[in-house]
A protein has these predicted regions:
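A short, charged helix-loop
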Residues: 128-132
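Mixed-charge (acidic/basic) macromolecular-recognition segments
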Residues: 148, 157-183
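A surface-exposed partner-binding patch
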Residues: 1-113, 164-166, 170, 188-201
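Compact, glycine/acidic-enriched structural inserts
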Residues: 133-163
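A short, sequence-level motif marking secondary-structure junctions
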Residues: 122-126, 148-150
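Residues in flexible loops and secondary-structure boundaries
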Residues: 45, 66-67, 116, 127, ...
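Short, surface-exposed beta-strand/loop micro-motifs that present aromatic residues
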Residues: 115-122
């Protein structure tokens, strides 16, 4: 396994002075997805909790109230979209092979432009999963030779090479923008029963 770049360093680079201490029942979260999840992602969730980067890249988190940004709900949403596209055009190839297909793509994030970001679940060890993406429109696919933490480090410093991701227009490194994970009336997604929470001070 490659030496992962530290989540604590990622947090420091992104402007967090301390962990937000977001707590998840990982047994429940992984059961909802149907697989173990990478250790760097779990550490990220504890440090960062709900939120995104530069009002552009959103990382999905287990247990939040907003279905649009909840990890298992995001996977279900992608499957719903794939079924709808197949009904409209039965002969069309799927945009991406979705988990739980062998080696299927498991969504962990998206951009406000509709681009999707995924783990490629090849092999048995989640800590070896790499990252891939697809644009909001079209059938192109792009691959990143690294894991979740490495991708986010590259995103913060604007060195990700995916054709549909634009160059950063903000100062570097890109800053993290925290969120509560709550559903907003009239917003995207649907309200869920939240099971994740921030640790009490």
């Amino acid at each position: 396994m490659r030496d992962p770049l530290g989540i604590e360093q990622l947090a420091h680079d992104a402007g967090l002075s301390a962990s937000r201490r977001y707590l998840v029942d990982w047994e429940r979260a992984e059961a909802a997805i149907g697989t173990r999840l990478p250790a760097d992602y779990k550490e990220y969730v504890h440090w960062f909790g709900p939120g995104g980067f530069d009002e552009y890249l959103i990382v999905c988190v287990p247990g939040v109230e907003n279905s649009n940004t909840e990890l298992a709900a995001r996977l279900a949403h992608e499957h719903d979209g794939a079924r709808s596209r197949k009904q409209i055009n039965p002969g069309a190839s799927p945009r991406v092979p979705l988990f739980p297909e062998p080696g299927g793509w498991l969504p962990w994030g998206f951009t406000t432009g509709g681009d999707g970001l995924y783990w490629v679940t090849s092999g048995g060890d989640p800590d070896r999963w790499t990252v891939a993406g697809r644009p909001g429109r079209g059938s192109d696919r792009a691959y990143f030779d690294g894991n979740f933490a490495e991708f986010l480090h590259a995103f913060l410093w604007d060195t990700v090479e995916m054709p549909f991701l634009p160059e950063a227009e903000c100062d570097l490194p890109v800053r993290f923008e925290p969120d509560t994970g709550k559903w907003r009336t009239g917003g995207a997604g649907e309200p869920l029963d939240a099971c994740g929470h921030f640790a009490l001070e």
